[in-house]
């Protein structure tokens, strides 16, 4: 506290400084992280205490002269007063719970009248002053700032809005007269008005805490809570930069700890069978860190829970990670950070778990209700053995808590780098939303009223950076629900808009519900049913424990990324049985080997060149998008809206994961809004088109382009499928829109089979070093290319040695059908024509391109068609 003591001492010396005898000396405490909700909370709390107050209106014009602010202020209806303001010293409280509180010492000195110019900053201030004592006054000010051309354009209008309200302003009606949508700043300041020689640093801290307690009655507890998080962080983090984020409050406990990842089928396939992993149950509790620090025993979770003391003698610190049951004050440990002063974070989980039981015994020695979670080490890949292991964890009836899932922990990594996955039954997957009642009279078709229901909108939190990278926009009515000051922060609410259900944020609340007033509350909810553009939501409970977090302006339910990744479990359900036998429906799950490096790079180069032809287009549809192998190419091309369609739910779930991966790890010049549609493209074009046109924001005239990379062979079974594809493209494209197909060329494949005299059920192979690299199995008798229906088996780089059946694409017939449905051929080209360009692109990769690679690549081609 030396710095604050020094500031107070200098304040007192100023009154003995003869050079300042004509100056006004101010000591003010300012809160810098104030939004409308916090401002309103403090304002209404002071009004409720019936503290004497006055309301004043003023206009201050500020002109920067060197390092000083030259001001002209008019406190209505008085005359203008000219002065300069010079800061002398400041002290900033470091604890996050202080909301950026700063103590400022400054002087004001009268100056001559000066001329205003275009650089002036104008501040209109509606101030309520509460005289809390003879020593202190608390000033709450609503401010509108104007600069440059705004001054002449908006000054009169905002004077009316701030000062000349239809109803006379009083402290009791002020908050109802001011519209938070009018882009105001909100300031809370405390000014000392007592005798200078009587002031102490303790007085400053006391009045600061008084205001913070109005915002949060548990302010002192919050301060202790953040100090406990700092203590834990000091043993986990070595980076001073990251520790600074903890100290500043930018990071909390959730950001500090390694997070459990909701496991999708695609995740599991990467390490199935999970031999070596540890499994335990997922208790229906909250994440908590149990700490023994000196003589104190506590748990840091959603708040600070004191569990007792060790007595007079301080102990070396022990820090355990686990799940906490607040009602029963029971702790269930699943990891250890420190044991009796020994740091364990750099050891693998298989080593840490050996010490965990010792840490639990330390807690038990002080009569703390603590247990170690039951773990099983998976040692067999046999599905039957795996099933028994998972059943022994998930279906155990003797646990003292409810089990709502299974945790899988990867061995061999440090504490922060340990990969931990969570599997939960679909029914137990829930999301936390900030719920707001939809404003009336918006005239938005999607917001159509329903009798017996009131429409509410569901929001989650998102960082400004992720909001931009995902190319999101605020939903209609957003600005009526959230003030501009909240929208301008680094973290703010956004409607829950997952890629496959852009309107999932609409919730029709039954008038008969036992949950009556839900506006402005955080609700835990689950999805009951998913229909076209409509989700049936069920309220599980009101998160009363989160209401205080809302007041800080930094919490709005789940984080957007967490919410959508949890949502994937509704999109692509992962059954309990699949934990043992492996995920079903994992098409092309294998990884490519190194022998395909050059050929894969060539195909990627060609697709990149093609997708660049549609750069910066507004709406693009990808038919058969799979798991988003081309997503990065669309992002590089600056496509604004991408609709990916596929019948493989697991692949689409992986695409959504990639969406976030690109947003957080890769730099793209432009942002792309991504939508996914789970749809079999062999179904009637009319039905598919209707679903696409119902995507929120999709243009009535259609998309600019349709792309389908290496997919249309699935739709060449018969003429009806080809006709259906052409009709679908016509319905989805705007006039002049383009279709871009890459495909294996049926005529070229047949030519290859003839050249090598491959008969029915025989296989053409391309070998390198006695290894089969490429292969085609002939599954048809005809000697000439049919319009449709001729099957081949293809050995693919990622098919783990298995043949996948597909139909030959008769490109002449395909083009004929598309012409019949209103398209013109723009270009048809073989992939082999790109090989010289690929050589210029990467000489090193071209050098390792083999003859087999070139032969295989020559079987593929590109077709471009334009809608007339």
Swiss-Prot record:
Disulfide bonds: none annotated. Pathway: mRNA processing; mRNA capping. This is mRNA-capping enzyme. Part of the viral DNA-directed RNA polymerase that consists of 8 polII-like subunits (RPB1, RPB2, RPB3, RPB5, RPB6, RPB7, RPB9, RPB10), a capping enzyme and a termination factor. The N-terminus contains the mRNA 5'-triphosphatase domain, the central part contains the mRNA guanylyltransferase, and C-terminus contains the methyltransferase domain. The active site is at 282 (n6-gmp-lysine intermediate). It comes from African swine fever virus (isolate Tick/South Africa/Pretoriuskop Pr4/1996). SUPFAM superfamilies: CYTH-like phosphatases, DNA ligase/mRNA capping enzyme, catalytic domain, S-adenosyl-L-methionine-dependent methyltransferases. Induction: Expressed in the early phase of the viral replicative cycle. PANTHER family: MRNA CAP GUANINE-N7 METHYLTRANSFERASE, MRNA GUANINE-7- METHYLTRANSFERASE. GO terms for cellular component: virion component. Probably catalyzes the second reaction in the mRNA cap formation pathway. Forms a covalent complex with GTP. Keywords: Early protein, GTP-binding, Hydrolase, Methyltransferase, mRNA capping, mRNA processing, Nucleotide-binding, Nucleotidyltransferase, RNA-binding, S-adenosyl-L-methionine, Transferase, Virion. InterPro entries: CYTH-like_dom_sf, mRNA_G-N7_MeTrfase_dom, RG7MT1, SAM-dependent_MTases_sf. It catalyses: a 5'-end triphospho-ribonucleoside in mRNA + H2O = a 5'-end diphospho-ribonucleoside in mRNA + phosphate + H(+); a 5'-end diphospho-ribonucleoside in mRNA + GTP + H(+) = a 5'-end (5'-triphosphoguanosine)-ribonucleoside in mRNA + diphosphate; a 5'-end (5'-triphosphoguanosine)-ribonucleoside in mRNA + S-adenosyl-L-methionine = a 5'-end (N(7)-methyl 5'-triphosphoguanosine)-ribonucleoside in mRNA + S-adenosyl-L-homocysteine. The record marks 627, 658, 713, 806 as: mRNA cap binding. In the N-terminal section; belongs to the dsDNA virus mRNA guanylyltransferase family. In the C-terminal section; belongs to the class I-like SAM-binding methyltransferase superfamily. mRNA cap 0 methyltransferase family. Coiled coil: none annotated. Its EC number is 3.6.1.74, 2.7.7.50, 2.1.1.56. One of its GO terms (molecular function) is GTP binding. S-adenosyl-L-methionine binds at residues 607, 624, 646, 710-712. It is found in: Virion. It holds the Pfam family mRNA_G-N7_MeTrfase. Residues 594-868 form the mRNA cap 0 methyltransferase domain.
């Amino acid at each position: 506290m030396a710095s604050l003591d020094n500031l107070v001492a200098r304040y007192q010396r100023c009154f003995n400084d003869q050079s300042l005898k004509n100056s006004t000396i101010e000591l003010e405490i300012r809160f810098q992280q104030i939004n409308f909700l916090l401002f309103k909370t403090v304002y209404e709390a002071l009004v409720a205490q019936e503290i004497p107050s006055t309301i004043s209106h003023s206009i201050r014009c500020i002109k920067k002269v060197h390092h000083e602010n030259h001001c002209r202020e008019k406190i209505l209806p008085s005359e203008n007063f000219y002065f300069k303001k010079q800061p002398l010293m400041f002290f900033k409280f470091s604890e996050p719970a202080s909301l950026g509180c700063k103590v400022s010492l400054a002087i004001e000195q009268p100056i001559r009248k000066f001329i205003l110019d275009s650089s002036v900053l104008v501040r209109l201030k509606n101030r309520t002053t509460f005289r809390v004592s003879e020593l202190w006054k608390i000033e709450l000010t609503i401010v509108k700032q104007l600069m440059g051309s705004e001054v002449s354009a908006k000054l009169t209008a905002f004077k009316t809005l701030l000062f000349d309200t239809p109803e006379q302003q009083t402290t009791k009606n002020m908050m109802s007269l001011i519209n938070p949508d009018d882009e105001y700043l909100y300031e809370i300041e405390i000014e000392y008005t007592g005798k200078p020689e009587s002031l102490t640093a303790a007085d400053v801290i006391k009045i600061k805490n008084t205001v913070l307690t109005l915002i949060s009655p548990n302010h002192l507890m919050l301060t202790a809570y953040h100090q406990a998080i700092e203590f834990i962080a000091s043993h986990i983090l070595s980076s001073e930069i990251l520790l600074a984020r903890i100290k500043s409050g930018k990071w909390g406990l959730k950001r500090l700890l390694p997070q459990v990842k909701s496991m999708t089928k695609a995740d599991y396939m990467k390490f199935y069978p999970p031999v070596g992993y540890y499994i335990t149950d997922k208790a229906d509790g909250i994440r908590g860190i149990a700490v023994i620090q000196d003589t104190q025993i506590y748990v840091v979770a959603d708040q600070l829970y004191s569990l007792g003391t060790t007595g007079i003698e301080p102990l070396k610190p022990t820090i355990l990670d686990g799940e906490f049951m607040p009602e029963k004050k029971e702790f269930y440990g699943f990891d250890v950070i420190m044991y009796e002063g020994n740091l364990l974070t750099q050891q693998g989980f298989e080593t840490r778990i050996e010490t965990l039981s010792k840490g639990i015994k330390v807690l038990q020695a002080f009569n703390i209700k603590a247990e170690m979670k039951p773990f099983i080490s998976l040692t067999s890949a046999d599905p039957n053995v795996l099933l028994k292991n998972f059943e022994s964890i998930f279906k155990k009836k003797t646990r003292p808590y409810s089990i709502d899932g299974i945790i899988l922990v990867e061995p061999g990594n440090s504490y922060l780098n340990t990969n931990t996955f969570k599997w939960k039954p679909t029914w137990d997957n829930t999301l936390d939303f900030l719920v707001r009642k939809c404003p009336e009279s918006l005239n938005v078709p999607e917001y159509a009223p329903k009798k017996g229901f009131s429409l509410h909108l569901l929001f989650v939190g998102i960082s400004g950076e992720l909001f931009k990278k995902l190319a999101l926009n605020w939903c209609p009515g957003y600005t009526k629900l959230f003030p501009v000051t909240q929208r301008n922060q680094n973290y703010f609410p956004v409607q829950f808009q997952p890629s496959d259900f852009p309107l999932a944020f609409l919730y029709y609340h039954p008038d008969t519900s036992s949950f009556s007033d839900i506006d402005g509350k955080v609700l835990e909810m689950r999805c009951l049913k998913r229909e076209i553009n409509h989700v049936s939501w069920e309220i599980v409970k009101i998160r009363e424990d989160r209401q205080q977090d809302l007041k800080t302006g930094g919490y709005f339910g789940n984080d957007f990324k967490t919410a959508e990744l949890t949502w994937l479990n509704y999109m692509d359900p992962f059954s309990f049985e699949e934990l043992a036998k492996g995920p079903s429906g994992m098409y092309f799950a294998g990884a490519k080997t190194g022998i395909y490096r050059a050929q894969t790079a060539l195909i990627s180069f060609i697709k990149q060149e093609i997708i660049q032809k549609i750069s910066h287009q507004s709406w693009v549809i990808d038919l058969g998008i799979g798991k988003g192998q081309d997503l990065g190419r669309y992002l590089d091309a600056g496509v604004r809206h991408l609709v990916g369609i596929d019948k493989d739910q697991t692949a689409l779930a992986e695409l959504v994961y990639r969406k976030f991966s690109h947003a957080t790890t890769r730099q793209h010049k432009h942002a792309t809004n991504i939508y996914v549609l789970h749809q079999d493209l062999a179904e009637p074009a009319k039905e598919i088109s209707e679903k696409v046109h119902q995507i929120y924001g999709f243009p009535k005239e259609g998309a600019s382009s349709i792309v389908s990379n290496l997919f249309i062979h699935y739709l060449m079974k018969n003429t009806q499928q080809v006709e259906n594809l052409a009709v679908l493209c016509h319905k989805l494209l705007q006039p002049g829109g383009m279709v871009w197909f890459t495909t294996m060329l049926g005529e070229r494949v047949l030519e290859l089979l003839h050249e090598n005299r491959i008969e029915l059920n025989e296989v053409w192979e391309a070998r390198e070093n006695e290894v089969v690299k490429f292969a085609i199995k002939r599954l048809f008798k005809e000697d000439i290319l049919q319009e449709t229906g001729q099957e081949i088996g293809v050995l693919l780089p990622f098919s783990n040695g298995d043949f996948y059946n597909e139909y030959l694409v008769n490109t002449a017939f395909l083009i004929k059908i598309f012409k019949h449905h209103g398209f013109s051929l723009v270009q048809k080209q073989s992939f082999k024509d790109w090989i010289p360009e690929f050589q210029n692109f990467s000489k090193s990769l071209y050098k390792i391109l083999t003859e087999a690679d070139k032969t295989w690549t020559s079987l593929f081609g590109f077709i471009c068609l334009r809608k007339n």
